[in-house]
């Protein structure tokens, strides 16, 4: 099962975290790829299988520049993403009124399009040295559990 990790960033933090997630998940035996949000469409997300969204919030609650087009496309979309499971890690600063708004938006859009949430959205206030590894571990646990359940079902059908 391939994992698609998309990131929205202005300063490179989300991209760095996306690469860290890919490295950890690959080490655990998962296939994972990292994609800049600027290079992906909602149509492509339909085939993502498992989608991890890592994004910061910029300005007054806006998505980063490289995430603007996908943000708008998801907002306007009526695609059925029910075959996609996802999790969102949002970076922000609690000092701002619209703390982690871009991440909250992506979570809301994906839920509205019937994507299956793996974990509640994580809102990180600059403390991602602690929260991010736990988030990746939780995702790995969910994916391993799902893979095990699929394997058991397939094995029992072979009998």
Predicted features and spans:
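FMN-binding flavodoxin-like domain, especially the glycine-rich phosphate-binding loop
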Residues: 2-4, 12-16, 24-34, 42, ...
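Glycosyltransferase specificity loop/lid
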Residues: 39
């Amino acid at each position: 099962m391939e994992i698609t990790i998309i990131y929205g960033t202005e300063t490179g933090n989300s991209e760095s975290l996306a690469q860290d997630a890919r490295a950890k998940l690959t080490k655990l035996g998962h296939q994972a790829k990292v994609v800049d949000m600027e290079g992906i469409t909602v149509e492509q997300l339909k085939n993502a299988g498992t989608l991890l969204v890592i994004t910061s919030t910029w300005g007054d609650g806006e998505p980063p520049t490289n995430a603007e087009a996908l943000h708008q496309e998801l907002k306007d979309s009526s695609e059925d993403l029910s075959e996609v499971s996802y999790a969102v890690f949002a970076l922000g600063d609690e000092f701002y009124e619209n703390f982690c708004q871009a991440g909250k938006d992506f979570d809301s859009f994906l839920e509205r399009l019937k994507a299956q949430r793996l974990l509640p959205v994580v809102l990180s206030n600059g403390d991602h040295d602690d929260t991010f590894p736990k988030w990746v571990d939780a995702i790995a646990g969910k994916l391993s559990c799902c893979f095990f359940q699929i394997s058991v079902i397939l094995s029992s059908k072979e009998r």
